[in-house]
A protein has these predicted regions:
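TPR-repeat structural position
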Residues: 8, 40-43, 79, 115, ...
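Terminal, low-structured helical/coil segments at or just beyond the last alpha-helical repeat
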Residues: 196-216
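Generic L/I/V-rich hydrophobic alpha-helical segments across diverse proteins
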Residues: 49, 85, 97, 205, ...
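Alpha-helical tetratricopeptide repeat
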Residues: 22, 53, 57, 61, ...
Length: 216
């Protein structure tokens, strides 16, 4: 191989050995390789290892399984089971799970809608700077989801997520500048942020840019 393949082979060998001792981290890492590595890609194997890691209470494996169960492409869609995994992983402080659990609670996925709890989980997910969580917390402040509307806090958080390449947040900053919503109107700055989102192919951002271009 080109060196990289050999390393993956060695990693698999190493993790396989460790997995026989039921090391959750080794089982989880094997799952990641089979889920994400092009050469070794095998979703069913990934799921097998994630399930074994879950038996060892690995919260990251619970989150990966929740994604599979939520999507329902490789295995049957099961939102109740995904909800349970997310709840356990979220309550053990795993950022991505806290954020996704917040989405479930916000939208009533898995049969339980609680906006104030969704807000709490989004807030908790930001403690380790998890960017999608920062964006969702900003949305809560912007729209008043599970908390009171606070446009200043929303702006700060959207900006933070935008600076880390989260283009949905760039769109929201553009929107706030374009319409003077919560901040002073600045069409030039609005364009800059809409462009960031438009460059990622976001249709709404392209539409907003077109509107601004017609005004000039």
């Amino acid at each position: 191989g080109n060196g990289v393949d050999v390393d993956i082979d060695k990693a698999i060998e190493y993790y396989e050995l460790a997995s026989h001792q039921d090391y959750g981290i080794a089982l989880y890492n094997l799952g990641l390789i089979y889920e994400h590595n092009e050469q070794y890609h095998d979703d069913l194997k990934a799921i097998k290892y994630y399930e074994a890691a879950i038996d060892q209470n690995d919260v990251r494996a619970m989150y990966r399984m929740a994604l599979y169960l939520d999507e329902g492409k490789v295995i049957a869609k099961n939102l109740d089971k995904a909800f349970t995994y997310l709840q356990i992983a979220a309550n053990q402080g795993y950022g991505p799970a806290m954020n996704m659990y917040g989405i479930y609670l916000e939208n009533g996925i898995g049969g339980y809608k609680k906006l104030d709890e969704a807000f709490k989980y989004y807030l908790a997910s930001t403690s380790d700077e998890y960017v999608p969580g920062i964006y969702n917390l900003a949305r809560c402040y912007f729209y008043g989801i599970g908390t009171t509307v606070d446009k200043a806090s929303a702006f700060k958080l959207f900006l933070k997520a935008s600076e880390r390449g989260y283009y949905d947040a760039s769109f929201m900053i553009g929107y706030m500048y374009s319409y003077g919503d919560g901040i002073n109107q600045d069409k030039q700055k609005a364009k800059e942020y809409f462009k960031q989102a438009a460059n990622k192919g976001m249709k709404e951002a392209i539409e907003e840019l077109n509107k601004l271009d017609k005004e000039v």
